[in-house]
From Swiss-Prot:
It is found in: Cell inner membrane. It holds the Pfam family ABC_tran. GO terms for molecular function: ATP binding; ATP hydrolysis activity. It is a peripheral membrane protein. The lineage of its organism: Bacteria, Pseudomonadati, Pseudomonadota, Alphaproteobacteria, Rickettsiales. It comes from Ehrlichia ruminantium (strain Gardel). Its EC number is 7.6.2.-. This is Lipoprotein-releasing system ATP-binding protein LolD. ATP binds at residues 40-47. The complex is composed of two ATP-binding proteins (LolD) and two transmembrane proteins (LolC and LolE).
Length: 228
């Protein structure tokens, strides 16, 4: 199976003279359609690594490869924006949905941004909202939804441009266990059906065990996790 995403010798340091090492020489390959869970204690560098993976933060050294396109500290903001919009999907613990927009408009927005017509964007958004079982709430405002429903909207939005990989940073962290499992199951099912890769940072070991592979970060070091 082809590699669609890779981290190569990623390091990240902060502070005067880069004295504080957050990520130390992280290497990872994710195959097409593979779901990889990232676990580790609070403050271990999970979110920092996800932000670097999503081209939202710049590593001190090393490269990110997305569909064999290399991104490093010298990659332009314009190229990073292109890659984010066309190959990456994002789901966060705090969804960043637009409160003044309807459910349907929130999911349509990424397609409008890349130049799709309203008709095409609407059709694709309705299809995905049906997938996450929100077809009867298309015109509702975000404020009218429960926490679990909002995360389902966020998942639909992350899928709308058919990304190569979804980066999910604690996507169910604010939900109760039953709702978290329901939301993650929807993401897992669609990713497997469409052969989309997922890189998931989570504290929830029940969700992590549903991944194809688990990696652990501790004190900035990334390693395979085999203690199922």
């Amino acid at each position: 199976m082809s590699i669609v995403f890779a981290l190569s010798a990623i390091s990240k340091s902060f502070g005067k003279n880069n004295q504080v090492n957050i990520i130390i020489n992280a290497n990872l390959q994710i195959k097409k359609g593979e779901i990889v869970a990232l676990i580790g204690p609070s403050g271990s560098g999970k979110s920092t690594l996800l932000h670097i993976a999503g081209l939202l933060d710049t590593p001190s050294s090393g490269s990110v490869f997305i569909n064999n396109i290399e991104c490093s500290a010298t990659t332009s903001d314009r190229e990073k924006t292109y890659l984010r919009r066309n190959f990456l999907g994002f789901v966060y613990q705090f969804h960043h949905l637009l409160q003044e927009f309807s459910v349907l408009e929130n999911v349509m927005l990424p397609q409008i941004i890349i130049g799709k017509s309203n008709e095409v964007a609407r059709k694709n958004a309705i299809e995905l909202l049906s997938l996450v079982k929100l077809q009867d709430k298309l015109l509702m405002s975000i404020s009218q939804l429960s926490g679990g429903e909002r995360q389902r909207v966020a998942i639909a939005r992350s899928l709308i441009n058919y990304p190569s990989i979804i980066l999910a940073d604690e996507p169910t962290g604010s939900l109760d266990n039953d709702t978290a499992l329901e939301v993650f199951s929807l993401l897992h099912k669609y990713a497997k059906e469409k052969n989309i890769s997922v890189f998931l940072a989570t504290h929830n070991h029940i969700l992590a065990k549903k991944a194809d592979k688990i990696v652990q970060i501790n004190s900035g070091t990334l390693q395979n996790y085999t203690d199922y």
